[in-house]
From Swiss-Prot:
Function comment: Potential calcium-dependent cell-adhesion protein. May be involved in the establishment and maintenance of specific neuronal connections in the brain.
Species of the source: Pan troglodytes (Chimpanzee)
Stated name of the protein: Protocadherin alpha-11
Biased composition (Basic and acidic residues): 780-789, 908-922
Major location category of this protein: membrane
UniProt region (6 X 4 AA repeats of P-X-X-P), positions on chain: 733-893
GO molecular-function term, one example from the UniProt record: calcium ion binding
Stretches of the chain found on the membrane's Cytoplasmic side: 718-949
Signal peptide location: 1-29
Domain of life: Eukaryota
Gene Ontology annotations of biological process type: cell adhesion; homophilic cell adhesion via plasma membrane adhesion molecules; nervous system development
Any one GO cellular component localisation term in the record: plasma membrane
Repeat (PXXP) residue spans along the chain: 733-736, 773-776, 795-798, 831-834, 872-875, 890-893
Length: 949
């Protein structure tokens, strides 16, 4: 490494200097090794890992690798033992020519952290090239007049090796005339010459064949030979002589063709043709015969090709001057041409990618790539500086001479810029300067930093009921700004339970397309609104997701035919037997057909038609179009048939309409043969006060108590529900949309069906409370104000009724036959308040046309819905002291009638009773107290047939 002489330095001090020197070499990041050329594959060069201070176990994890600009495949490192070895054939002459120094520069790169070490491996020469003569045969013309000791220069051999391996010795084959004078020192300045030992005698020996052998100084020795053909000439005994034996000339490498290098001059002391000289080129080294020309007459040497300083810095030209004597004589000289450098080479840029692509969350100062620059020129022309494209989040950092690192300068965002095209510019210091560029494409790798996003927070979907299983009802789509698997969105249901069933039993979502399918036919009567959430989640790590709300409204279809309710004659749909006295007059109600429809809206609006009698005969009966009441059209007489078979067609208003047929058998009897129920009815009709003492009065009282308890329970339950955290239900936030199958006239199935349940502004009004079991979620406060109808004091939010609130078996037997809405029903908000159109229950009237134009009460409400009604059933208001015609039983569509009829009218006691306003209730109580005596008298006759209820 270095040598030290002991000049008074002690051994400890010398060791300290050696230790400091060793630390200096390690800190500089350079190692030096040597290897012989032509070494076999696997030849040991050095323990590079140990010398660099690296552990063998960390070579592979730290991506230990060796790189070389031009000779990367000659040497390799075994990552198992950290040994640098020969990987392929090394030819020193091919690498460095005859340069005295020859080394291979390596870059050792390791990651985590990134470190770069520089290693120089010196290639030692071996004797692998024999001496070579440029010609296989050299011809010499020697005049016989030559004196002894005359010298004849020969072209020596060349050896591609260096130092001792290129040190040549010559020997001449045995002969009596010539000896060989060869160079004896290492520099070999002395020319190889053939020396004449004694005079020649052409007549005796006109020609000589000699062999010159060149031997190098290597071990083992290698030799080369050339044949010398010596022809002995006569007379001409003076050689041409140059002014100098050697010439030195400097020439710019960009010299143009035909540029004069120099003009040689040789003279011959002979006279005549023996003194005329011609010039010729013997050799130009190295390989420059095509670069120069020599005029054989005037001795001018000119440029004939393109000179390149980077290829050869010197040329050696051997020139021979020959006279025209017989035999001709020759003189020799050497011309040394030095090539001067010009800035004719652009810099070269080499980029080694290390960390591409770059993650968008990479930290600043992250090394992206290594860049090396070089320039084949020398001096200032070979000094190179680098620059980078401006306004990019990267920068160049110089790590070593002509080596740079491309590092991250600021944060990246792939969603803004997904790739950068960087231009590295290398510029030399020449005048004018030359430059070169290299492009580096830096792709930004995606990181999962964006969640899938839906276009809307919620969607409203309308689906008709009875859809086929697997029906596609909607498609959700979410967009993810990331790329590849980070943008691969999959969809799934946010599972929850709907009652006792899981949401996944109703709908499913295709994981890839986002298509929402109904797994089973939906039933409007069972489920009007299906609200659920769909989750979109990407495939990144960790995955990100978002939810969207779907409100699926199930639209009603006319899929339920009218159903006849049970009558006193037997099961539903059976024939009803009625006995009618012949003495009744026109308008007498004989019977009432009761039917319900499970559909809603127009699909549940029922109408009744009396089928024509057989044979086309006219019958004295008709049926109310919407009431189902069968009444007489005229007074009966003896001419009428004693038995009538009436077929009543019950039809809804759906498309197509569905029907049911009820059979009523009417028997005309004499007044004395009428049943007791009819007698009781007649008595009640004759005495209006006696009807109030009927058992129905007790039923009214019981119903009032039960209804009050139900209302109180409902209000308490609603208050507790609204005070809790709203999730889903009557008080939950959202944007409900009501589904309306159609709207006709002044009636529509709209927001008017709602009444406030859980408002924070005070107790609800008692004028009307309407509950629907399948309305969507309530509005928020802003939307409540927008949707509130004029004249309405409080916006309402419906709630699902308790499924336990059902009418009893005794009440179910007397359910009203036709439940519908009045077209002109009037709701009064209070004294002087504005009137509103609200769905009500029509009162049965003796007039056949009364209430027959009303829309259905079940528009959107099934048979399990229940409604409190306070107010009249038609525009006609009850007068003071009058009782309301009907009351609606909470939890049941049944109507109990307490309407008073004329004495000659027969009213079916199965009509349901409706509740009037508070004032009317008080009036009824007064009437009840005023008729206590009559109530006791009629107590024995108060038992009625349950079928009439």
């Amino acid at each position: 490494m270095f040598g030290f002489q002991r000049r008074g330095l002690g051994t400890p001090r010398l060791q300290l200097w050696l230790l400091l020197l060793e630390f200096w070499e390690v800190g500089s990041g350079q190692l030096h090794y040597s290897v012989s050329e032509e070494a076999k594959h696997g030849t040991f060069v050095g323990r590079i890992a140990q010398d660099l201070g690296l552990e063998l176990a960390e070579l592979v994890p730290r991506l230990f690798r060796v790189a070389s600009k031009t000779h990367g495949d000659l040497l390799e490192v075994n990552l198992q033992n950290g040994i640098l070895f020969v990987n392929s054939r090394i030819d020193r002459e091919e690498l460095c020519g005859q340069s005295a120094e020859c080394s291979i520069h390596l870059e050792v790169i390791v990651d985590r952290p990134l470190q770069v070490f520089h290693v120089n491996v010196e290639v030692k020469d071996i004797n692998d090239n024999p001496p070579v003569f440029s010609l296989r045969e050299q011809k010499l013309l020697i005049a016989e007049s030559k004196q002894s000791d005359s010298r004849f220069p020969l072209e020596g051999a060349s050896d591609a090796d260096i130092e001792e391996n290129a040190l040549l010795t010559y020997r001449l084959s045995k002969n009596e005339y010539f000896s060989l004078d060869s160079p004896t020192n290492g520099k070999q300045i002395k020319r190889l010459s053939l020396i004449l030992k004694k005079s020649l005698d052409r007549e005796k020996t006109p020609e000589l064949n000699l062999m010159v052998t060149a031997t190098d100084g290597g071990k083992p020795e290698l030799t080369g030979t050339v044949r010398l053909l010596v022809q002995v000439l006569d007379v001409n005994d003076n050689d041409p002589d140059f002014d100098k034996s050697e010439y030195k000339v400097s020439l710019m490498e960009n010299a143009a063709k035909e540029t004069l290098v120099l003009k040689l001059n040789a003279t011959d002391r002979d006279e005549g043709v023996n003194g005329e000289v011609t010039y010729s080129l013997m050799s130009i080294k190295p390989n420059g015969r095509h670069l120069f020309t020599l005029d054989q007459n005037n001795g001018e040497v000119r440029v004939n090709g393109t000179l390149d300083y980077e290829e050869n810095k010197f040329y050696k030209i051997e020139v021979q001057a020959t006279d025209k004597g017989t035999p001709p004589m020759a003189g020799h000289c050497t011309v040394w041409v030095e090539i001067l450098d010009t800035n004719d080479n652009s810099p070269e840029v080499a980029v080694t990618s290390l960390s591409l692509p770059v993650r968008e969350d990479a930290q600043p100062s992250t090394v992206i790539a290594l860049i090396s620059v070089s320039d084949r020129d020398s001096g200032v022309n070979g000094q190179v500086t680098c620059s980078l494209t401006p306004h990019v989040p990267f920068k160049l950092v110089s790590t070593f001479k002509n080596y740079y690192s491309l590092v991250l300068d600021s944060a990246l965002d792939r969603e803004s810029v997904w790739a950068y095209e960087l231009v590295v510019t290398a510029r030399d210091g020449g005048s004018p300067s030359l430059w070169a560029t290299a492009r580096v494409s830096v792709e930004v790798a995606d990181v999962n930093d964006n969640a899938p996003a839906f276009a809307q927070p919620e969607y409203t979907v309308f689906v008709k009921e009875n859809n086929p299983p697997g029906c596609h009802i909607f498609t959700v789509s979410a967009r993810d700004a990331d790329a590849q698997e980070n943008a691969l969105v999959s969809y799934s249901l946010v599972e929850r339970r709907l009652g006792d069933r899981a949401l996944s039993s109703y709908v499913s979502v295709h994981a890839e397309s986002g298509k929402v399918y109904a797994l089973q036919p939906l039933d409007h009567e069972e489920l009007e609104l299906l609200q659920f959430q769909v989750s979109a989640r990407d495939a990144g790590v960790p995955p990100l997701g978002s939810n969207v709300t779907l409100q699926v409204f199930v639209l009603d279809e006319n899929d339920n035919a009218p159903a006849l309710l049970a009558t006193q004659a037997g099961s539903a749909g059976g024939a009803v037997n009625k006995l009618v006295p012949r003495s009744v007059g026109a308008g007498h109600v004989v019977a009432k057909v009761r039917a319900v429809d499970a559909d809603s809206g127009y699909n549940a609006w029922l109408s009744y038609e009396l089928q024509p009698a057989a044979g086309g005969s006219r019958i004295p009966f008709r049926v109310g179009l919407y009431t189902g009441e069968i009444s007489t059209t005229r007074a009966l007489d003896e001419a009428d048939s004693p038995r009538h078979r009436l077929l009543v067609l019950v039809k809804d208003h759906g498309e197509p309409a569905l029907t049911a047929t009820a059979t009523v058998l009417v028997s005309l009897v004499e007044s004395g043969q009428a049943p007791k129920a009819s007698s009781r009815t007649l008595v009640g009709a004759a005495s209006p006060e006696a009807a109030l003492v009927d058992v129905n009065v007790y039923l009214i009282i019981a119903i009032c108590v039960v209804s009050s308890l139900l209302v109180l329970t409902l209000l308490l339950y609603t208050a507790l529900w609204c005070s809790a955290t709203p999730t889903e239900g009557a008080c939950a936030p959202g944007k409900p949309t009501l589904v309306c199958s159609r709207a006709v006239g002044s009636w529509s199935y709209s927001q008017q069906r709602r009444q406030r349940v859980c408002s924070e502004e005070g107790p609800p009004k008692t004028d009307l409370m309407a509950f629907s079991p399948s309305l969507p979620l309530g509005l928020n406060k802003e939307e409540e104000g927008e949707r509130q109808e004029p004249g309405s004091n409080h916006p309402g939010q419906p709630r699902q009724p308790n499924p336990d609130w059902r009418y009893s078996a005794s009440l179910r037997a007397g359910m009203h036959s036709s439940v519908h809405l009045e077209e002109a029903g009037i709701l009064r908000a209070g004294p002087g308040g504005p009137d509103q159109q609200w769905p009500t229950v029509s009162s049965a009237t003796p007039e056949p046309e009364a209430g027959e134009v009303s829309p259905p009460v079940g528009a959107g409400v099934n048979s399990n819905s229940w409604t409190f009604k306070y107010g009249p059933g038609n525009p006609k208001q009850s007068g003071p002291g009058e009782l309301p015609d009907k009351f609606i039983i909470p939890g049941s569509p049944a109507i109990i009638s307490i309407r008073q009829e004329p004495a000659n009218s027969q009213i079916d006691k199965s009509d349901f009773i409706t509740f009037g306003k508070k004032e009317e209730t008080k009036k009824k109580k007064k009437k009840k107290k005023g008729n206590k005596t009559q109530e006791k008298k009629e107590k024995g006759n108060s038992t009625t047939d349950n079928s009439d209820q």
